[in-house]
Structure formats: structure tokens, C-alpha cells
Amino acid sequence: MAAANAPIAMREALTLTSLGIAPQFVTFTHVTMESEKYICVRETSPQNSVVIVDMAMPAQPLRRPITADSALMNPNTRILALKAQIPGTTQDHLQIFNIEAKTKIKSHQMPEQVVFWKWITPKLLGLVTQTSVYHWSIEGDSEPAKMFDRTANLANNQIINYRCDPSEKWLVLIGIAPGAPERPQLVKGNMQLFSVDQQRSQALEAHAASFASFKVVGNENPSTLICFASKTTNAGQITSKLHVIELGAQPGKPGFSKKQADLFFPPDFQDDFPVAMQISQKYGLIYVITKLGLLFVYDLETAAAVYRNRISPDPIFLTAESSASGGFYAINRRGQVLHATVNDATIVPFVSSQLNNLELAVNLAKRANLPGAENLVVQRFQELFAQTKYKEAAELAAESPQGLLRTPDTVAKFQSVPVQAGQTPPLLQYFGTLLTRGKLNAYESLELSRLVVNQNKKNLLENWLAEDKLECSEELGDLVKTVDNDLALKIYIKARATPKVVAAFAERREFDKILIYSKQVGYTPDYLFLLQTILRTDPQGAVNFALMMSQMEGGCPVDYNTITDLFLQRNMIREATAFLLDVLKPNLPEHAFLQTKVLEINLVTYPNVADAILANGMFSHYDRPRVAQLCEKAGLYLRALQHYTELPDIKRVMVNTHAIEPQALVEFFGTLSREWALECMKDLLLVNLRGNLQIVVQAAKEYSEQLGVDACIKLFEQFKSYEGLYFFLGAYLSSSEDPDIHFKYIEAAARTGQIKEVERVTRESNFYDAEKTKNFLMEAKLPDARPLINVCDRFGFVPDLTHYLYTNNMLRYIEGYVQKVNPGNAPLVVGQLLDDECPEDFIKGLILSVRSLLPVEPLVDECEKRNRLRLLTQFLEHLVSEGSQDVHVHNALGKIIIDSNNNPEHFLTTNPFYDSRVVGKYCEKRDPTLAVVAYRRGQCDDELINVTNKNSLFKLQARYVVERMDGDLWDKVLQPENEYRRQLIDQVVSTALPESKSPEQVSAAVKAFMTADLPHELIELLEKIVLQNSAFSGNFNLQNLLILTAIKADPSRVMDYVNRLDNFDGPAVGEVAVEAQLFEEAFAIFKKFNLNVQAVNVLLDNIRSIERAEEFAFRVEEDAVWSQVAKAQLREGLVSEAIESFIRADDATHFLDVIRAAEEANVYDDLVKYLLMVRQKAREPKVDGELIFAYAKIDRLSDIEEFILMPNVANLQNVGDRLYDEELYEAAKIIYAFISNWAKLAVTLVKLKQFQGAVDAARKANSAKTWKEVCFACVDAEEFRLAQICGLNIIVQVDDLEEVSEYYQNRGCFNELISLMESGLGLERAHMGIFTELGVLYARYRPEKLMEHIKLFSTRLNIPKLIRACDEQQHWKELTYLYIQYDEFDNAATTIMNHSPDAWDHMQFKDVAVKVANVELYYKAVHFYLQEHPDLINDLLNVLALRLDHTRVVDIMRKAGQLHLVKPYMVAVQSNNVSAVNESLNELYVEEEDYERLRESVDMHDNFDQIGLAQKLEKHELLEMRRIAAYIYKKAGRWKQSIALSKKDNMYKDCMETCSQSGDRELSEDLLVYFIEQGKKECFASCLFICYDLIRADVALELAWMNNMVDFAFPYLLQFIREYTSKVDELVKDRIESQNEVRAKEKEEKDLVAQQNMYAQLLPLALPAPPGMGGPPPPMGMPGMPPMGGMGMPPMGPGPMPAYGMPPMGSY
């Protein structure tokens, strides 16, 4: 088939390699395509990058350096998702980026690896791990949410797709896995379907799947469908299916019935499988794409096959839906991006002609609005109409492709149908069907509206218009205007009938809408006339209209000044102002005149409005001097100030402060220059200082930065206004850091009596001059001293303050300051009072009044400096009595006691609160021993050491150091730099330590000597303590320390100390001696303490004398010692000696090392003795196993047999395997036989060439592996009988059959192999593989048995495998039989035709032909029979009649010149009314002069060239042939030619019937004249009745009267008069009923008017309408137009109809 005529159009969109992408990156793992918008390619060389191909601009790929394991572009937007594995983990890091915004949207770290991911919606990512499936939304901050766990059937599968339905309620996961062992090339497909609502999964077998929505007839809600394709093997049979199933059936609603269809794979594609499925919602088609490039197209609704073809020579690995085109994109391994879509022009003709599926063709055309089914649709419509199935016809017309039947003719056809009583008119059925399907066109909308308006159902129109069901037109608006103006306006607007819209708005007085609408549609009305019209009735509406005009694009169509004058002419000041204010908002220079104008008219009439306009500041181009004068006259002084520009004018107006808002005046000062502002302020103060001071102060505060603070201060000082200065500086003070400003403010506040403010500023301010302020306050002598107290307290003038207050007798303030303000400064106050010689009683009282709040230390210092410390005795004692623990209190009291020498030792030793360091320092020069007491009490180490060194008090120092037991203190006094160290050590050794009874003090001293690294002094010390009989002579630790110190400092003394001392830690000291390499001393220590193992270890490990160790072991005779000796001997390689020592030690713990060493030394005899000893100690499998192995090595097989019969824990299996590996087969045989390991025993017997025994053992083992090993060994040894026994047990296993067959065949044992397989057929477990393999062997080596075999066992064969074998061996008959059995009818037919001498059989071929799927094979079969078996061709054609394109068959036979050969076939299929068949048969009938058959053919089948046949027949010599020609002319509507031909042959009856059927009055009357001319009176009478409806009565009567044939015309006249009178009676009756209805309606209207007039007095009087705008709207009809009446439609009810044909014959 030519590509242009194919139903599916293919094109290459682009090639990835042409964009610079290397071929190695065109793979499933590197390329992703989530939609038709983007392709994303991940490159890893020469550098890591991601290439994004925008399908709208494929030549401009975007390449970004990104490292990732996978990259996905969002289906709709430029959002990129990246996945990368975290190094060293199995976790994946996911990120989502917005490429356009260059921002990261979100990221997440998955705890497990994501093996597949996909955008399932534009907002949702599907993540598939090894165990579960997650959904991750790109919106918000949510993490991936788990949806479900993967089912078991998807374990170890490669996931290739994941999808969800549009509602996200159904999810499907697709994976593939390696094929079954018998057919590994055919990949398995597995599917998991999950329901979100039910939280359940279903596992299915499928390679590809997709979701679809489909509307089932009778259900308004769409059904969710799942489609999936699978290719599976079952018992060697391959099944390829497509399934369409509804998910979640809707209760109570019609459901979608399950569909399935076969996928027919060509022979060369048997291992091909589906990799993708896409569904076109646009066309309702399913696309199934396979790996090798096959495309299957199926109908979604019926699952009917539409098309199959190969679209790519290279494997396809990726597809994506193309929703815009209704097709899909596919990418193959070559890098081609292929685009497939439906060929709109050819698919419907293809389905109707090639597939002969007319119903599907019509459904496709209706579904997707496609061409090609016009004739079918029209024909079907006519059939339905003829069958009065009006509802079905209406539905067909509504769904007709491309609106084929949506024409006025169709409407007229429905209108013409008579309406039966009680039934819905067909026309309304038609319109109702159209409304449910969509929108009506203009003609349909108009006709439906006529019906609705006539029935007064306006609400239906409103609903349809709201739902956009009607197409609006001007005619429709005119129709609706008769009942509803508002609705008509909406229709006019939608129909863009601009003049009608403007007229309607004008009638409604919605003038603003006129402007909006005119602008939208580009229409220009008369604006000035409209504005004048609105002004008369609606001033505000006129303003709005004018404003809308001003906002029009291109400027206002009427001048602003003209519009303003129109308002002012009618004294509409406010309206003119409103208009001008709005249009003058842009504040343009060209509007200066209008700005001045609006201000003038309002300053004269409405000053407040003018003031508001000026306040808004919206104008800046008006005449300011003119406006200033008008403002002053109107009393708007502030506005006048703002507009005057001369200083005199400003001064003149400004003094009117009574009429100016103070705040506004202050703001006005901000517009003046500095000099003018100061002049105006001065004038204001001159005119009214008291009244204007507040305004001047406010202005000065507001604009102090511009005017200058100094200038303002000078202004107020000039008028001596301290009040003004106070208020001005008060506002400026918080932001100023100028000391002078702060001082002036304090001064002004003091002058104005603001004492509290002075107190506040002196307390809070940090910027005034303290000295200057203090002097001012002292000079001012304010009654309140608190400001002075603040200054002096804050700035350290406390003595001056105290002196001022004391000299001014303000003692109350002194007490207040000390007690309340700052008690901390009381010492300074006391010191100044002492300097001022204040009485001590006042000072003591002042001190006692503060008590604990008083800081003692500075007070003591102040008194101590003045030698008045005793003054505080009472105060200090008072504090102590109150329980004070203040160190300063007790220090001062101690100093007083020391100075008075009042038992100071008692105070120093008993008082816990004084500071030892302070008091000790105070005592150093007075009495050093008191200082030592103080320092000892406070542990003041440094001070005590210094004072004792300085005064040579080393004995006290030594005692203190020993008693302190402080390591840091010892370190300090024992430092080499200490010049007094020797004196201290002497006192410690001679006095301090001998006096001490505390072990801790001794220990601390010893530790200090060790830390100071004084070993000799330490030995001296320890010898004195330990060796001389002291309290510590037997001290364990000291003896240890003495020996250890000697080891370190003087090793020669160690052996003496070891012999003299007994109470020391022998093991520990011995280890230290070993570390110090004093091995003999260590040996002596261990020996002294009976530590024999440690002692022998010293001999072995340190002294390295095995002989001394062995002697020592004999002496002590301990097992542990012998064990150490044995281990040493083992290390030295003395294996036999070591084994003997281990036996002496009775030590079985090191048997592993002994076994390893014995095996290396090959001393199995000694090992046996050792292992027997070990077995007495331990029950270890290793020991028993090694014992057996040792017996085997020394060939003691009988011992092995005895041993295994005894209780043992040996792992005999492992032992046997080891013996087998070491080729000790006899021993292994004993073990395997004992443990009944028949499999190993069989193999072992094979090694020993004992085949019969091996077979017996294999039988007991019953293992496939064992059987194979024994079998192959028997084959190699040519023991075929035994080999067959084994083989029969192997071939029942499918997986092992092929291996056995190959083994036999490789060694040329064909007969034996066939014998084996034949024997296998009778086995109970015989399977398909045995039968198949035997068939293959027959095909190769015994072809004469092949056919019998496949016929006997056809159901138990793997037919595809046998097909390949027969094809290879060219067994065509058998091959054909196999194809038939496998339902591969295409291949069977091809084989029969290609190898007919061997394979053809007519009955068989007929059976095959009807099942062939490839249409081309039908015609190949026709050619085949035509060439080889022409006598049987009709039989074949009759069988294939339903599948053939009859036109093509006829063409084949016509070209071959054998049409007559297939006449029976053509007769059989003529019922299909195919043009080629009809013409061929007609041709044969003419040729055979068979007019009866020809007439029957012409009458029943009209699809042929009628005129051509008629022209051919009208000259035929046979009359019947010419009658047929006339008949054809009549059917074709060529009435004159038909009549002329009938006249010529005197066939008058035919003439009359032709006239009657033509409906042509002229022809009928001409025929009457012809009969009169020919004198055929009887024919004249017959013609009158046959053409009754066409002949006018006057014509008939005239012709009869003139030609004396009235008698022959009389029956016609009687019938005519009877019918005429009946019609008149009916009309009279209808007229009377109509008049009665009119009278009743008039009466109802009168009653209604009377009822309405009851409330007439409540209605307001009607207002007179302006000229041209009043009165009812003019009628829409044109003058002279007759009334429309019933809108040109006949009445819908049934009416009398004329009789057709002959009238009834009345009695004469």
C-alpha cells in the first residue's frame, strides 16, 4: 500500500544524532520524553551534561553541565527533575529546578534507591523503588508519600513504565523480566494494577498498558478503561492479546463490556513484544508499539483491528503521547524521533473499503469529524428516515462528520414528516438531539426559535443562549425582539449587528453602553446629538457619558470647551465642574484656560468647592495671580497666601490669623525662604506677641533646620520670650547634642519656674556642660536642690554638693541624698563632712541610718586615710551583731583588734569571715607568726611560703607543706629553682614526716618526690621509713615503691630488696622487672611467689632456654607449665616433642594448631595418638573428622569402619568430600555409603569404574545432576543400556532435556538418542519438550516418521520450535500442518502457495484461507488459483466472499480476461451492491441476452453506470432489452427519454407509469394529447387515473370535450368532484373553529384589561418624552410586508392528504 494512502501517517520529526548527541547516549537510561514538548538526554562524556530539546525549536537544544543519574522534563513547563545517587550509599538525592526562573523548587533525599521515575501528571512525580511506589508533589513542602508496595510478580523486573488515570484513582506499574528457559528470547511482561480507593493490587501479565476515558451510551459520566497488551507462552504456545476492561463500574449505569483481540505477529517477529501503548482520545484508537518497530492500531470501543505495519527498522525503546495531533512520538536506537498520527483523509476510506468494516468507518468519522464516510452516512440516514426511525436518524445527523447532514434540507425533511397524535414531532426530536450534542448553527437556531416563540416558551431560549447552544444572527434577534427586547439585545450583540445594538441601547437609555460597545466594534455614532439628548433628562448621565467620551481612544470626539459650554448654558455648574475635574486630571499645559475657568466659576459661586480643588493640588497651569485675588476676596486667605509671590502681599494676608488654620499657616511657612519666614515671624510677634507666639513657636519647631536654631533662639531672645524659648527648645532638645542648647533649655525652664522639667533634664540629659550647669544652679539657689543633686551625683561633684548643702544648712537634702539617691557615695559624703569638721554624732547617725546599704570598704578607706577608723567601731559591731558576713566588715574589725592587741590569735583562728590574705598582709610587718596563722587558715600558699622564706621559718613551712598534701604546692617548693629546697627537704625528712602519723601525708610526700624526679632522695626517705623500724615498715605500697624505685634508679639493690622484703606485689613487680630486662630478678620474684607459669614464661620468652624450661617443668610437674613448654616446642617446629608435651599436660585446647602442624610435618601416626587423647577431653567434629582423615592417610580403612560405627560427632559429609577431593576414593566410598549420600557415592563409583553400582546409587539419589553425571559417563564408556536408564530419568526434566540431546548428538549417537526419546514418550512424566525434541530428531534423521508423529502428538508439541526445524529441513507439508495447528494461517497459506507441489490440498487451503489476517494474501490466493486451479476458483471465492474487496477481484479477473469464470461468485456477492460487480454481471447478461436476470439486477442493485447501460441497451435488437433501457432512464429521472423510448415501442402502460412517477404535470398533459392524437381513447382514460395527481381538471375536461371523449373522462371527473367537496367541507369547519377561538381570546383580553384598570389611579402620570425619543419602537417589519402568519410552516397536526395513485372507483 502506498504511504500516501496509508491510514497512519509517519514522519521523522528530528534525529538526535544530528543535534550532536553521540549514539551511545541514545538508550533507555539516557533519553527521556515525558510529553510531546521536550526530549531530555543525559550525556556522560566528554563531560557530564543534560541536553534539553524543545520540540517547538528542535534545532536549538539547551545543553547544561549537570551531573545526574537521570533527568526528566516536566510534561508542560520548563521544570527539570534530577536524580543522583549519593556516593557510598544506596540512597538517591532528588531535586526539582525551574529552568526559566533558575531556582530550586524543592529537593529530597530518598532512603532507598529509585529504580524508575516518571511524571504521571504535570504536578506529580511517580517514584519506584525496589519495594514500593511513592508520589511526590512539586507543590508545597511535602515529602514523597508512599502509595503501595510492589507485588511479588514484579520482583527482579526492570520497570519500564508507570501511569495513572486522569482521576488519580487507578495506578499501573509495568515491568519486564527475562523469558522462560524454553524461550528466553521472548521477554516476560508483568503488570501491577492498584486501586487508590480500595487500597488493593492485582498482578497481571502484560508488557504495556494505558488508561482511557470512554462515554458509554446511556451514561453521562465517562467510564475509566484500562487497556493492556500481553504476549505469553503456555505449554509452548504463544498467545498475544489486547484487553480493554472497565475499572470501577458505576452502579445502576450502563457499563463498558470487556473486549479483547489478538495481536498477530509476523513469523519473523515471534520473539518481538509490546514495549509501549498510547491511546488517542481524539480518535478513540489504541496504538501498540513493539520493540522491533511494529505498530498495531485498534479501535478503543470495539477492540477491532484497524492497521498493522512496521514503522521503524531499528528497535524502539521510548514513546510519548502527542495529544495535539492524536498520535504519538517514538524514539529508536538510531536516534530517530518518529511522529505517527492518523491520516485524516484516508483512514475512513481504508476502514470501509480495505477492512470492509462499515460500522467502524462511520463511528470513526463521527467520533473525530473525519471525511470519507459521506456516502455511508447519507445512505444510512435515508434508510433510517425511510424506516421512520426518526430518533436514530436525528442522532446520526447530529453526529454526522463535518456537519454533513446539518443542512436546511435536513430540517425541511423533518418538517415535512406528518406528526402523529400524542407523539413528539420528529423536528423537535431532531433539535433536541442537536442540543444534547452541542451547539446549533444559524439556520437551525432560527428554525428552533420560531417553534419556541410560537409556543411562548421564552425561558427555553434564555437557557439555550446561556448555555451557548444557539448561534446568534440578526434574523434571530429580529424574531426574538417581538417577545423580549433584552434577550434580543443579547442576540444582536453576539451576532455583531451593530446598528440594531445601538438602537436598542438608545431605546433603553443606556448611553454609556453605546460608547463601550461602539469602541469594541469600531462604530461611530453622533456623539453631540446623544449628549444633548441626555442633558435634557439626566444631567448626571450626561456627565458620565461625556467622561466616557473623553476616555475614548484617539481622543474625545467633542471638544472639552464645547461640552463645558453645554453644561453652563443650562446653569449646570456642579455637572460642568465634575466633568472638568475628571478630564483635567492629566494636568496638561494646553488645559490652562479650562483650569482657570473651573476655578473662577467655583470661587464666585461655590468657594468651598474651589478650596477643595486647590487643596487637592491637581492643577498647576491656571492663572495664579487671578486666582489669588479671587481667593482673597472670597476669604480664602490661606489659598491667597499660597498663590501670592510678593512679600508685601504675603504680610498683608498673613496677619489675618483669626481666619487661617494655625497648622495650615505653619505648613505655609515651609514654602517661604529663610529670610522671608523670619520677617513674617517677626511681624506676627510685633502685631500680637501673646496671641501669635504659639504659631511662631510651632513654625520654628517645624522648620528649625531650614531657619537655623541659632536664628530662632535670637528671635525669641530679642523679644525676651523665655516662654517661647522654653517651648521651642523643648521640641528640639531630644534630637540635639549641643551642650549650649541643653544649658539654655535648663536656664529657660528655671526662669519660667518649670522646676520639674529642670530636674528631669538634669537627670536624663547627657549633653549639657556639667560644670556650667552646677555653677548656674548654685547661683540660682533654687528652693528645690534636686536638680543640683542630679548634676553633682552624675558628674562626680559629690564633695562640692556636700559642701554646698552643709554650708547652706540643707542637712535634710544630705540625709535624703545618702539614704535615697545614692547610698554608694556615702563614703565621699562622710569624708567631706569630716573635712568640714562636722560633728561626729551627725556623721555616726548618718552612717547608722544607712547601715547595710553603705559600702564598707570605701568607707573604711576614707576613715583610714584620715586616721579615724575607730569612728566605725560601733557601726561595725552593730553590723556583726545583725549577722553580717561581709568580708570587709570583718577585715576592718580584725584590723582594729590587731591594732588594739586584744587577743588577736583567737580572732584569727576562730573568725571564719575575714579575708586571710588582706589581714595576713596587715600582720606581716607587725608579727610574722600572726601572718602565718592567717595564711594557714586561708591556705594562702604563695604568701605563707614567701613569709616563711623571708623569716627562715622552714620548720613551719615543712609542717604546712606536709599537712597540705597538695601536689601543686609540692611541685612549687621542690622545683630546682627554689633556693630553699634543700632546707625544706631536710626539715621534711628529719621532722615533718617522722612526726606524721597519717599515711596520706606520707603518700603525698612520696608522690611529690617521685614527681619531682628525686629518686635518690626518695630512696633515702623510704629506707628511713621502711627499713628502720617505723610505723610504716610493713607497708605494702612503700615496699613496692622502694623496689620499683630501685629498679629505676639503682638496679644493683633490687636483688637485695627482693630477698629482704616479703610484703610487696610479686606479680606486678615481676612484670616491671621483666620490662626493665632484669630477667633473673623477675624469675626469682615469680619463683619466690610460686608463680610457676610466669616463671617458665620468663625462661621461654626472655631467657629463651627451652632446656631450662623443660628442667623446670620436670621439677614442678604442673600441667600449665607443660602446656607452655609444648606451645614453645610447637612454635619451634618440634612437632613430635610438642605432641608428647601436650599429652603430658593433658591439654586439648590447641588441637587446631597441632593438627595443622602435624599435617604440614606429615606425622599422622603421632597425630592419631594426640587426637585419641583429645577425644577423651572434647567432642569436636573437627577432631573426629581429622582422626578419620589421618586413618585414611595411613591406610587404616578397617579403623575407619570401626570408628564410624562408634559414637562420634564428625561431619561425615565434609570428611567424605575431602577424601573425594584428595582422591582417596575407597575411604570416601565407605563414608558415602555409611551416610547414604547416594549422589556422591554414584560419582565416586564412576571414578572407580563401577558403573552398575553407580547406576544403583543414582537411582537411590534420584537427582538430575547425579543422573546426568552417571549418564554422560556411561555414554563415554559406551554403556548405552545403563545410559538409557539414566537418560529416562533426566529427560522428564524440561531444563535438562536439551543438554542430554546435545551430548548424544555431539558424540554421533543419533539412533541411541532417538531410542531414548521414543522410550521417554511412554513415561508418566513425559512433557512437551520430549515430544518436540523427538519431532526435531525425526525432522533431521528420520523424516519418514515426522508426519505421523506430529499428527499423533500435535497438542503436545512446541510448535514454533518444530516449525523452525521443518523450515530448515524443507519438510513443506509437515510445515503447513504445523502452521495450521499453531493458528499461523498467513504463514500456512504462504507456504502452500510457495510449495504447492508438496503442500497444496484444496480443502485444507480453503480452511486456511478464511482464517488469514493479511488481506494481501487473499488476492495472492486468487492469482494462485487462477494460474494453477482455475476450476476451483469459485469455490475459493465463495469462501472468502466476506473478506474480499469485490472490486479488486473483478479487476483481477477482467485483466486476466476470465470474468465469465467467476460469474457464480459475482452473483453470490451482488447483494453488496458493488459497482464493479454490478457492471460486470450486467455486461455478461447483455452478452448472454438474459433480460430477465438483467432486469432483476438493474431493479435490485443501482450502483452502476446507469446512463451508459441505458444508452447501450436502447439500440439493442431485443424489445425487452429496450424496455430495460426505458426503465433505467425512468429510475435516473430522465423522464422524457424514457417516455420517448416507450412510445417508440408502443409500451403505453410504461409511458403512463413513468409520467405518474415523474410528478411533472406538463409531461402528463402532453401524454394525454399524444393519446388523443393517436386515437387511443382507452389509454386516455387510463392515463387520467394513473396521473390523477398531476392532471388539472380543467385541462382534462377541455381535452375530453374538444375531442369527444367526455365519456372516457367522466369517471375521473366524478372522483375529482367528490374529493373537492370533501376538502371544502373540512375548510369550512376549520374556519368556524378558528373564529370561535378568536372570540374566546378577545374576551379573555378584555377581562384582563378590566382587571388591570382597577389599579390605574395608583400609577404616576406619564412624563412627556423628549422629541425623537418617545413612543413605542417602530415595527421591525418593512412597509408593505404581509403578516408572517404561521412563519411559512404548514400546520404541525395531521391534515387531509390527496390520494396517491388511482382514486377509489365509485359506483357509476
Curated annotation (Swiss-Prot):
Protein name, please? Clathrin heavy chain 2
Q: Which organism is it from?
A: Oryza sativa subsp. japonica
- Gene Ontology CC: clathrin coat of coated pit; clathrin coat of trans-Golgi network vesicle; clathrin complex
For region Heavy chain arm, the annotated ranges are: 537-1708
Region annotation (Distal segment) maps to 537-648
Q: How does it assemble?
A: Clathrin triskelions, composed of 3 heavy chains and 3 light chains, are the basic subunits of the clathrin coat.
Give me the ranges of the annotated region WD40-like repeat 6. Answer: 271-314
* CHCR repeat placement: 551-697, 700-842, 847-986, 993-1138, 1142-1283, 1288-1434, 1437-1580
Query: Signal peptide location in the record?
Result: none
The answer to whether the entry has keyword Membrane is yes
